[in-house]
């Protein structure tokens, strides 16, 4: 693997471009500070992203901060908010204690947990998807998104048309069901409640929201119905305990209820998905399971010549990620997406726009061939590409010239002049090749 020496925590300069190897993969985690359009390394990383075909994403709470949802570990994150809220009742070492499965041993902690989760749920209900969420949806629209693995529990992706793994997947025909998933929720879904006994999930209701707001976890209606049915039939109640409803999220110290399914799906993505780029956004990668996910994807992507990048404002520990993550871009995720829009605008065209542009180019090519055939048939010399582009009418071909003018007008609306798409580069290359084999004239050279 060709290596690039990691830069110190300072911005790279364009003068490095002459020393850059052909491969952008690194043996040690390298840092890119800020979003400088003149940064040669950043420019090349961006270009490789635009050319990738199967992109995997891993997201954390950092991509939802601009939607008004706090992250976990920052100075104003969820852990600190919980710690401040609880300080008037008792002293806790970390807000993380309120997200540990052991809290269900203490009725008082359950009450605080219920109140806090209802506040977070209400906050999520008002939140709107960020630019980063929409970027992930755009990857799907371009048929470039392999899968998005998210640690977030807000489910904002669903509101922009992405399919979430918030329901249990059938074990039969697993691969076809997994293929239709856009987002895999690694830590559960705040928008549903689950029973602690029968594990049935339910959408929130106003009544249950009021219960949690009072610090109470409601009883499971399915468990109650089963017990009442057995009592009416004169049968034993099988332990009699009724489950309680809690937010359907994964707490520290408990396993994901769909852990085996997610592992099976990840292996399917690695073996058959052929990922060639991994974008990690808005996470400091502290959770062990997430670390393993990144390492597995990294090996496959590096074997295929791809890159792994992390976009996050907070630095991560370097030594544990050498040879796994190539670059950390120190930036807000939404700002990075805005930077991409300015650097690779064609990448952000919709699939429909691209199809229309290709169709117009094919039609224009067919019309040029028709014009050439008609001119050859009447013994006139072929018109140079420059004159055709200028729309110079030749007697008997007015109708064809009018069609070409119309096509060029529509094309300009779809593809703005300032954008330099790969398709334009190919077309310009073809034009230059044709020019090499044609005699040049003084007035054409002056043009």
Swiss-Prot record:
Belongs to the sirtuin family. Class I subfamily. It catalyses: N(6)-acetyl-L-lysyl-[protein] + NAD(+) + H2O = 2''-O-acetyl-ADP-D-ribose + nicotinamide + L-lysyl-[protein]. The keyword Metal-binding applies. NAD(+) binds at residues 60-79, 151-154, 282-284, 312-314, 333. It comes from Saccharomyces cerevisiae (strain ATCC 204508 / S288c). Its cofactor is Zn(2+). The active site is at residue 187. NAD-dependent histone deacetylase, which contributes together with HST4 to histone H3 'Lys-56' deacetylation, regulation of telomeric silencing, proper cell cycle progression, DNA damage control, DNA recombination, and genomic maintenance. Present with 319 molecules/cell in log phase SD medium. This is NAD-dependent histone deacetylase HST3. Residues 365-375 have a biased composition (Basic and acidic residues). Residues 35-363 form the Deacetylase sirtuin-type domain. Zn(2+) binds at residues 195, 198, 220, 223.
């Amino acid at each position: 693997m060709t290596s690039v020496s990691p830069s110190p925590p300072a911005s790279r300069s364009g003068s490095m471009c002459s020393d850059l190897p052909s491969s952008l993969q690194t043996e040690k985690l390298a840092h890119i500070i800020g979003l400088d359009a003149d940064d040669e390394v950043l420019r090349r990383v961006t270009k490789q992203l635009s050319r990738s075909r199967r992109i995997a994403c891993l997201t954390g709470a950092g991509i939802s901060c601009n939607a008004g949802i706090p992250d976990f570990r920052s100075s104003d994150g969820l852990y600190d908010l919980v710690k401040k809220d609880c300080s008037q009742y008792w002293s806790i070492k970390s807000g993380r204690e309120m997200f540990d499965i052991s809290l269900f041993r203490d009725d008082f902690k359950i009450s605080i947990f219920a109140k806090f989760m209802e506040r977070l749920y209400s906050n999520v209900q008002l939140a709107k998807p960020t630019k980063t969420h929409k970027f992930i949806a755009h990857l799907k629209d371009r048929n470039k998104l392999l899968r998005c693995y998210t640690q977030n529990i807000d489910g904002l992706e669903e509101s922009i048309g992405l399919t979430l793994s918030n329901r249990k997947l059938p074990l039969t025909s697993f691969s076809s069901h997994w293929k239709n998933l856009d987002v895999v929720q690694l830590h559960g879904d705040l928008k549903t409640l689950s029973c602690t006994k029968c594990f049935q999930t339910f959408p929130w209701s106003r009544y249950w929201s009021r219960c949690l707001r009072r610090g109470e976890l409601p009883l499971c209606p399915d468990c109650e119905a089963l017990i009442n049915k057995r009592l009416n039939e004169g049968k034993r109640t099988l332990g009699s305990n009724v489950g309680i409803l809690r937010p359907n999220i994964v707490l520290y110290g408990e396993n994901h209820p769909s852990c085996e399914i997610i592992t099976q799906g990840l292996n399917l993505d690695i073996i058959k998905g052929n990922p060639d780029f991994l974008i990690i956004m808005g996470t400091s990668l502290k959770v062990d399971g997430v670390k393993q996910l990144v390492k597995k994807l990294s090996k496959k992507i590096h074997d295929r010549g791809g890159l792994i990048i992390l976009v996050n404002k907070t630095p991560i520990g370097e030594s544990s990620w050498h040879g796994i993550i190539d670059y950390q871009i120190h930036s807000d995720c939404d700002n990075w997406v805005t930077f991409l829009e300015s650097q690779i605008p064609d990448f952000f065209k919709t699939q429909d726009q691209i199809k229309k542009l290709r169709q117009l180019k094919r039609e224009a090519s067919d019309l040029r061939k028709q014009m050439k055939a008609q001119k050859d048939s009447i013994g006139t010399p072929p018109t140079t590409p420059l004159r055709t582009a200028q729309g110079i009418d030749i007697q008997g071909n007015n109708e064809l010239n009018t069609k070409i003018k119309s096509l060029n007008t529509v094309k300009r609306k779809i593809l703005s002049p300032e954008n330099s798409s790969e398709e334009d580069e190919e077309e310009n290359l073809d034009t230059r090749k044709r020019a090499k084999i044609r005699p040049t004239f003084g007035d054409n050279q002056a043009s």
